Amino acid sequence: MKPSVIEILQKLLTYPSITPKECGIFDYVRSLLEGFEAIEVEHEGVKNLLLYRCFGEGEHWCLAGHIDVVPPGEGWSVDPFGAELKEGYLYGRGAQDMKSGVAAMISALAKIDHFPGTLSLLLTSDEEGEAKWGTQLMLEHLKERGFLPKVAIVTEPTSEERFGDTIKVGRRGSINGKLIIHGKQGHVAYPSKCLNPVELIAPRLAQIAGYNLDAGDEFFEPSKLVITDIRGGIEAVNVTPSDLKILFNVRHSTQTSAKEIEDYLHQLLQGIPYTLEIKPSSKPFLTSRESVVVKRVSEAVKRVMGVAPKLSTGGGTSDARYFAQFGVEVVECGVVNDRIHALDERVALLEVEALERVLLEALG
């Protein structure tokens, strides 16, 4: 008898799979999906697994996620790897992010006996860390084999207050920057002999801190330049600093590029000595609301939950961005995310069961 989606999740939660440890989860998953072929790619201690089954000559649809979790830390009221069940909730590190999604994908795939094309499950043990040798590497491998999926559904925890209220059809990009304003150190009593970088940047700071680089649109919030750190000087009240360093991040839409951010700052900082470094971390992407996968998942959520989901691009980055970079139409749909990475992380059993039904509807 096949285990239920809840039983699968309980088992997954007992594995202490802190990035990049896989802890034997892949063997367990393979035992649940008989009849699926396997492709395994391991690099630098990171394990990746693709299980696939060809039902017909149609499109390749992939369900994807990660089995690694962040460290639990101290202060839990339960064993973070004990999979304790209390009052309709399962507790454990990864309950929401994202072993609930993994369990739902496994359980759904185990129940499907017909599909017009190929179905696959892609799992990685490197998403919560650098994500350098995880999904991205696996997709490169699949591209070399001519086996990239046409469509992907990533079961990250996307819901905000109630399961199904939000699905992700894109993500903002992330750009990190470092700006150093160069001055000349000196005694505060002799300002004519100093060049104070604080005074140089002060009139321009309001056009950097919290500045909206675009107006946003239906799917993306404005691309905001957010200062995360400012420091300079030697903690002496009578010495002006030689340099002032500003660190910043921009979570940006498809309307604003790294080049445009760089051009804006160069224009703003004309006339003062500075050094600027811009480093893109991830690119933004948007899957069309008219794409088959967005329509399928949206309609599935509406049938199961009775409410049409909001299409969002908010939140941080996820492995969905890698699918988009390889030209795969991707959407994210998962449980409520109110306790991800938090103490006493938990997930409602009803949400996990509903997610499985959504996947079955979307793939049916």
From Swiss-Prot:
Q: Could you tell me what this protein is called?
A: Succinyl-diaminopimelate desuccinylase
Residues annotated to bind Zn(2+) 2:
D97, E128, H341
Q: Into which family does the record put it?
A: Belongs to the peptidase M20A family. DapE subfamily.
Q: Which Gene Ontology molecular function entries are recorded, alphabetically? A: acetylornithine deacetylase activity; metal ion binding; succinyl-diaminopimelate desuccinylase activity
What is this protein for, i.e. what is its function?
Catalyzes the hydrolysis of N-succinyl-L,L-diaminopimelic acid (SDAP), forming succinate and LL-2,6-diaminopimelate (DAP), an intermediate involved in the bacterial biosynthesis of lysine and meso-diaminopimelic acid, an essential component of bacterial cell walls.
The UniProt entry's GO biological process terms, in alphabetical order, are: diaminopimelate biosynthetic process; L-arginine biosynthetic process; lysine biosynthetic process via diaminopimelate
Pathway membership of this protein? Answer: Amino-acid biosynthesis; L-lysine biosynthesis via DAP pathway; LL-2,6-diaminopimelate from (S)-tetrahydrodipicolinate (succinylase route): step 3/3
Region forming the signal peptide: none
Q: Which metal ions or organic cofactors does this protein require, according to UniProt?
A: Zn(2+); Co(2+)
The gene name reads dapE
The catalytic residues are D68, E127
